[in-house]
């Protein structure tokens, strides 16, 4: 299965009538493996900052998580595994695997829990596959 297929079928899938706004699988070095057509153009520094928070949880809390120029308030995640951010009625979930970051961006009517489930389910699967 190609990385683009994972994005199209596993991340941009329908859940209770809702879809993520955008999604991507990005290498820990910031290289794009696959992304939805509307995934925001991000800066390498933004991915570096996200990776730093996985290495040292809490580093993003004071400044927020920035992705594609959008600032998200960091909310409770799982240290070293998941970072969650919120902005107004939407937000972002980032799941770290051995080699990649799985990123899902959502907006209402999708709920944070639905986004978390989609992103973390794929992340867990890839970890089980040694990715």
Curated annotation (Swiss-Prot):
<dbReference type="Pfam" id="PF00235">
    <property type="entry name" value="Profilin"/>
</dbReference>
<dbReference type="GO" id="GO:0005856">
    <property type="term" value="C:cytoskeleton"/>
</dbReference>
<keyword id="KW-0020">Allergen</keyword>
<dbReference type="InterPro" id="IPR036140">
    <property type="entry name" value="PFN_sf"/>
</dbReference>
<comment type="similarity">
    <text>Belongs to the profilin family.</text>
</comment>
<comment type="function">
    <text>Binds to actin and affects the structure of the cytoskeleton. At high concentrations, profilin prevents the polymerization of actin, whereas it enhances it at low concentrations. By binding to PIP2, it inhibits the formation of IP3 and DG.</text>
</comment>
<dbReference type="GO" id="GO:0005938">
    <property type="term" value="C:cell cortex"/>
</dbReference>
<dbReference type="InterPro" id="IPR048278">
    <property type="entry name" value="PFN"/>
</dbReference>
<dbReference type="InterPro" id="IPR005455">
    <property type="entry name" value="PFN_euk"/>
</dbReference>
<dbReference type="InterPro" id="IPR027310">
    <property type="entry name" value="Profilin_CS"/>
</dbReference>
<dbReference type="GO" id="GO:0003785">
    <property type="term" value="F:actin monomer binding"/>
</dbReference>
<keyword id="KW-0206">Cytoskeleton</keyword>
<keyword id="KW-0009">Actin-binding</keyword>
<protein>
    <recommendedName>
        <fullName>Profilin-1</fullName>
    </recommendedName>
</protein>
<comment type="subunit">
    <text>Occurs in many kinds of cells as a complex with monomeric actin in a 1:1 ratio.</text>
</comment>
<keyword id="KW-0963">Cytoplasm</keyword>
